[in-house]
Amino acid sequence: MILACDVGLKRIGIAVLLNGVILPLEAILRHNRNQASRDLNDLLREKNIQVLVVGKPNESYADTNARIEHFIKLLDFKGEIVFINEDRSSIEAYENLGHLGKKNKRLAIKDGRLDSLSACGILERYCQQVLKNR
């Protein structure tokens, strides 16, 4: 199974590829990086993940890239790790919330649904860029 994550300072959005369908999962709320890495490790084991797709912004965001790489190194994951450009994934996910009212959009941001929708976009890019070439 393949899992994608959108690593942020407060939340980690999660999506999985299940039988060819991309599904958002409940986001991991970060209290600190050790707790968040434990929670992600548990999920990777529980779902028997073989490939972890991680969204990273372009090189001009050096601090963010370093933070994401450091976080991923905290994981005890033996499968394949693939980094995919995540530029605009959060913006695209937010645009997909157009059907929600203002209050529900704010709630979707706060509870991590937006982050998991962003992870769906990252996983979709992985499928388009990597899986179609296999």
Curated annotation (Swiss-Prot):
Pfam families: RuvX (PF03652)
Gene Ontology MF term list: nuclease activity
Alphabetical GO biological process terms: rRNA 5'-end processing
GO CC terms of this entry: cytosol
Main location: cytoplasm
Coiled coil residues, start to end: none
InterPro entries assigned: RNaseH-like_sf, YqgF, YqgF/RNaseH-like_dom, YqgF/RNaseH-like_dom_sf
Keywords: Cytoplasm, Hydrolase, Nuclease, Ribosome biogenesis
Keyword Nuclease included in the entry's annotation: yes
Catalytic activity, EC: 3.1.-.-
Matching SMART domains: YqgFc
Compartment(s): Cytoplasm
Assigned protein family: Belongs to the YqgF nuclease family.
HAMAP family: Nuclease_YqgF
Functional summary from the UniProt entry: Could be a nuclease involved in processing of the 5'-end of pre-16S rRNA.
Name of this chain's protein: Putative pre-16S rRNA nuclease
